[in-house]
Amino acid sequence: TGYVVAMIGGRGTKEGNLTLNRSTDAVRQPGSTFKIVSTYAPALDSAGMTLADVEVDGPFNYDNGRPVSNWYSSGYRGICSLRDGIRDSLNIVTVKVLTQITPRLGYEYLQKFGFTTLVDGVEKNGKIFSDVQQALALGGITYGVKNIELNASYATIANGGQYIRPKLYTIVKDHDGNVILDNTSTEGTQVIKPSTAFLLTSAMQDVVTSGTGTAVNFGGMSIAGKTGTTSDYNDIWFSGYTPYYTCTTWTGYDNNTKLRKGEERSLAKKLWKAVMSQVHEGLENKSFSQPADIVAQTVCAQSGKLPTALCGETLKTEYFAADTVPTETCDVHYQGSVCAYSGLPAADACPFATEGTLEMLPENERILTGQVTSEDSQRVCEHSSVFMATPGADQIIEQERLELQLRSNSAQYEALLVSLQQQLQTAVEDKAIADQA
């Protein structure tokens, strides 16, 4: 409805008038809570992407050359779906998605969601600042956001995609009872489709059940939400909702002191749980409603496409808007002629061709360095008829043949070594049993 049921603007007893209300006036960096509204909402709503689409969580730079880092600092997870990106708050996956759909589209959606503190080409101390850039995906913006506006954006998702401006009053009358201000209208603006809202809700339920927000659960109530933490721990958030209410909590210091490890860094989630568990007392647990145009479809988890017989144990069921259900079949799992040297599908003149199966995983270095034919953009080895006809190809093939033989010998040696170690271990165990007897 847009009605604000409760608001806390600071700690302790209010001791004055016109004091800082951190819920309506403070502007803070939103961290990963912004991933949902800046990136995944537009990606699913109008960019043709789905929760099953995959991106590679691997080394990636912003356009200015600065590397994008995940919040867990080191290592990469390889191929990940958009659902994984939401559940585990993956920075690299999210930036890649916004890069594809363009920061401009993300910025336009944020304006529809009701944010008033974003800028596009503002001058500050002789420099021009704009929030229309890749860091928008992670909440890296010029000024920040207001709690009440962030909460309203999540309430929009909870409301089936309809934005209603937050209401702090209903009706104002004069001393004669005449209505001066009427704020009871519940009309809103459709920002995202109901199907998009459901998909976001489904993914954010994973955040609460198995992702970064498990601490907010209470009483079996259906909850969807997203955590948010700035890189320097100045701001920590949780924004989420149930079928009844939406709530956003922020913790931090006015002077930007870093929140300390332990209790301070988990306070936003604990506060959210404490508040929401009270306002839901006496309310029945119920599920989020599912629009009629949502379809459940089995896909290959490594391609996000319809599975083939080769996909094996990588199958999963995902929700789709009816008009985005995959029609293409998996192109990750391959069976056919394989180049024994490169591990890629064999080109037309490959001297190392053999029958086999393989996974065309994007994070695999040998796949990334493979050539692409102009005919069908299929990654194949370099041994095409054109390559084989080039001067010096014979010498290259001979070198590769020797390297392949060395690999084979090395593999045989390692297998022999493992066998000898197993025999030795068995002999030691047999001797120990004999000694005990």
Q: What would you call each of these model-derived segments?
A:
Residues 1-8, 13-26, 143-342:
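A penicillin-recognizing enzyme superfamily signal
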Residues 2, 29-55, 85, 153-157, ...:
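Active-site SXXK
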Residues 15-37, 51-54, 135, 139:
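Short active-site loop at a secondary-structure junction
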Residues 39-48, 56, 60, 87-91, ...:
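Sec-exported extracytoplasmic/periplasmic mature domains
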Residues 48-106, 133, 175-206:
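Conserved catalytic neighborhood of penicillin-recognizing serine enzymes
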Residues 66-71, 102-150:
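Mid-domain, small-residue-enriched loop/turn segments at the edges of structured enzyme/sensor domains
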Residues 297-417:
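Low-complexity, Gly/Ser/Thr/Pro-rich intrinsically disordered linker/tail segments
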Residues 410-437:
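Extended amphipathic alpha-helical heptad-repeat regions
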